[in-house]
């Protein structure tokens, strides 16, 4: 079927998607879900079997990453296929790739080449460590970036050694930052009339996500340590056991500290010197946390959330993934959005985390079968049906 825009927001933009695994597809998903005409370009099955790089098509992971796209198979190592790719570049706005940096040069699809074909083209590249430099040629993996980006040194309980986070955060954030870079370049192009090369890496994204923890080192020369579920500087903030589980508390600042102490019927804490200021509470974190947990163990998580919310004290339950999607607010936000897919039939995938009131997004196209739209897309380029069979015989597509 022809491209059906998932939103009017980016329906005027055509994107050539050369990405694989996670960081690149995450970037392209942001464009596809907001209406861009995304053409996912993949090697033919004979060249690269399904699942060789990343999740196979029948997994929830693949389905969640690749909705709202069409699929074209092209063997970019073939001369005729590269000619077809160049024709696509002439008619497109954005090319996104996350190959190792030198692959673009070998294939003849680096920015200097694409810019000559279409001066308005935006090439977006995600790498492990940057396009050049001492580590420029290294392949990038999320867990490696989590370690080299410092995140694992501040994740987990004190003394237990480095710990990765439960999602591929470097991949995901590199993809999101890449999408932001693309959108910035598209806006700038309206002024200059020119494209440009957008680059980011897993390492850059991970370091940026350190945020205030990185700033503590850069400005104060403080090396943050593992703090488990405790906040590094705000006390009491963390996880506290209840009679049927645990809750998160975020008691930051003197006003909320006072509300909290009164709500749990412990006004005497307000008079104790060891808890009289934020600095004092930080220095006496362990003793204060112990006293708080003696109190929170006396009621259920639901009771504490209800009572503390009434007095404006930040708190919340700690959900498993199934509980997340059963929460009434999550349902209200429509974070699980319906779609029909080939492997799962009618199911739900994770929706976008922001809304546009005039140009909302939707799931208009199920994740494609490899090469599902090859004939259609090549016909749009002016390649006739009688040429397609010879292209297939030559492993061009």
Language model features with spans:
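A glycine-rich dinucleotide-binding beta-alpha-beta segment and adjacent secondary-structure elements
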Residues: 310-364
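Glycine-rich beta-alpha junction loops
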Residues: 45, 129-130, 202-207, 244-246, ...
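Aromatic-enriched alpha-helical interface/lid elements that frame and gate functional surfaces
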Residues: 230, 235-311, 315
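Flexible, small-/acidic-enriched active-site or ligand-binding loops
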Residues: 2-6, 276, 340-390
């Amino acid at each position: 079927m022809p491209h059906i825009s998932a939103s009017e927001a980016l329906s005027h933009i055509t994107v050539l998607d050369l990405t694989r695994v996670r960081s690149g597809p995450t970037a392209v998903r942001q464009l596809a879900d907001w209406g861009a005409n995304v053409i996912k370009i993949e090697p033919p099955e004979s060249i690269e079997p399904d699942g060789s790089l990343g999740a196979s098509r029948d997994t929830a992971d693949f389905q969640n990453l690749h909705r709202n796209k069409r699929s074209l198979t092209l063997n970019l190592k073939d001369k005729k296929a590269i000619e077809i790719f160049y024709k696509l570049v002439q008619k497109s706005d954005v090319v996104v790739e996350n190959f190792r940096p030198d692959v673009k040069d070998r294939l003849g699809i680096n920015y200097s080449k694409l810019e000559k074909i279409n001066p308005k083209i935006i090439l977006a590249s995600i790498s492990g460590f940057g396009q050049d430099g001492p580590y420029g040629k290294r392949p990038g993996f999320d867990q490696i970036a989590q370690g080299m980006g410092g995140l694992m040194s501040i994740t987990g309980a004190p003394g237990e050694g480095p710990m990765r986070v439960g999602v591929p955060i470097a991949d995901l954030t590199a993809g999101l930052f890449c999408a932001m870079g693309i959108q910035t370049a598209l806006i700038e192009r309206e002024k200059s009339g020119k494209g440009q090369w957008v680059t980011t890496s897993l390492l850059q994204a991970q370091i940026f996500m350190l945020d205030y923890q990185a700033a503590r080192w850069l400005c104060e020369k403080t090396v943050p340590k593992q703090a488990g579920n405790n906040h590094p500087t705000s006390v009491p903030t963390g996880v506290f056991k209840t009679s049927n589980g645990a809750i998160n508390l975020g008691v930051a600042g003197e006003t909320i500290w006072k509300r909290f102490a009164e709500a749990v019927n412990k006004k005497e804490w307000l008079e104790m010197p060891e808890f009289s200021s934020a600095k004092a509470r930080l220095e006496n974190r362990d003793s204060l946390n112990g006293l708080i947990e003696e109190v929170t163990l006396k009621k259920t998580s639901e009771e504490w959330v209800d009572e503390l919310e009434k007095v404006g004290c930040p708190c919340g339950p700690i959900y498993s993934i199934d509980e997340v999607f059963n929460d009434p607010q999550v349902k209200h936000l429509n974070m699980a959005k319906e779609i029909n897919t080939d492997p799962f039939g009618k199911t739900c995938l994770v929706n976008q985390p922001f809304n546009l009131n005039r140009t909302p997004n939707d799931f208009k196209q199920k994740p494609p079968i490899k090469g599902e739209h090859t004939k259609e897309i090549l016909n749009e380029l002016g390649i006739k049906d009688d040429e397609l069979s010879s292209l297939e015989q030559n492993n061009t597509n």
